[in-house]
Amino acid sequence: MSILIDKETRVLCQGFTGKQGTFHSEQAIEYGTQMVGGVTPGKGGQSHLGLPIFNSVHEAVEETSADATMIFVPAPFCKDSIIEAVDAGVRLVVCITEGIPVLDMLEVKAYLRQHPDVRMIGPNCPGVITPGECKIGIMPGHIHQRGKVGIVSRSGTLTYEAVNQTTQMGFGQSTCVGIGGDPIPGTSFIDVLEMFEKDSQTQAIVMVGEIGGTAEEEAAEFIQSNVKKPVISYIAGVTAPPGKRMGHAGAIIAGGKGTAADKYAALEAAGVFVVKSPAEIGKGVAEATGWSTH
């Protein structure tokens, strides 16, 4: 088992013929992902990377039975692209794009609430991968290894760090989910923690958080009552000054809330094994689980 995606997942790309859409679709195909086509309005009927192009997601789903989509369209058009995918019956929408207006995401969230059977990952995220089976997003496939650690993260590059270390230690990953660095994500830490807790392949969970917002504190509360599996966590931004945005739109300490210290305190109180440096994530997993390494 894994969560969200597996080798049966049929994937579309919205923004298929653009530079990023092309590059990451190529990478996904190379990885073994079942890419079934792409959407670029006005180019329907043509083919690209040996796959059909459609004018709309509805048309693409009808023709290919796609059940997942990765979105590589410019930020101003993402809201419409996401809603179009939801309306077409796609069950998993992965939006990679950064810079979507917060107001647009509020509208998307409200729309998703009316469609509880649809799961959206992102925006501003690296995507999701089940090693050896399916890769939807921008993560480097070669560092992943099929295994037993579920990884969920607000950061892209720190996800790769956690992946690389758990691969080198021989633990591997069940599924890795980048929920994204924006203030309003489609999927929260809690959503993913709940999935990992129920997943038989996942035996330990790595959660990479960062300053800003209260997502980690809420996750800590959830872990305390609902998660029996060992959770290892790292929070980025310990030295970040208040009021300064640190890369991600959501990574800002505002109104005295959202500091790394607050988050670490909440996680430790919930029994989470915390590490204070990204270099310690792999060791943290070994220590928290008692697993022997390579």
Swiss-Prot record:
SMART domains: CoA_binding. CoA binds at residues 17-20, 43, 96-98. GO terms for cellular component: succinate-CoA ligase complex (ADP-forming). Transmembrane segments: none annotated. The keyword Nucleotidyltransferase does not apply. Keywords: Ligase, Nucleotide-binding, Tricarboxylic acid cycle. InterPro entries: Cit_synth/succinyl-CoA_lig_AS (IPR017440), Citrt_syn/SCS-alpha_CS (IPR033847), CoA-bd (IPR003781), CoA_lig_alpha (IPR005810), NAD(P)-bd_dom_sf (IPR036291), SUCC_ACL_C (IPR005811), Succinyl-CoA_synth-like (IPR016102). Substrate binds at residue 160. One of its GO terms (molecular function) is succinate-CoA ligase (ADP-forming) activity. Pathway: Carbohydrate metabolism; tricarboxylic acid cycle; succinate from succinyl-CoA (ligase route): step 1/1. It is an enzyme of class 6 (ligase). The active site is at residue 248. It catalyses: succinate + ATP + CoA = succinyl-CoA + ADP + phosphate; GTP + succinate + CoA = succinyl-CoA + GDP + phosphate. Its EC number is 6.2.1.5. HAMAP family: Succ_CoA_alpha (MF_01988). Succinyl-CoA synthetase functions in the citric acid cycle (TCA), coupling the hydrolysis of succinyl-CoA to the synthesis of either ATP or GTP and thus represents the only step of substrate-level phosphorylation in the TCA. The alpha subunit of the enzyme binds the substrates coenzyme A and phosphate, while succinate binding and nucleotide specificity is provided by the beta subunit. Belongs to the succinate/malate CoA ligase alpha subunit family. NCBIfam families: PRK05678.1, sucCoAalpha. Heterotetramer of two alpha and two beta subunits. This is Succinate--CoA ligase [ADP-forming] subunit alpha. It comes from Coxiella burnetii (strain RSA 493 / Nine Mile phase I). The gene is sucD.
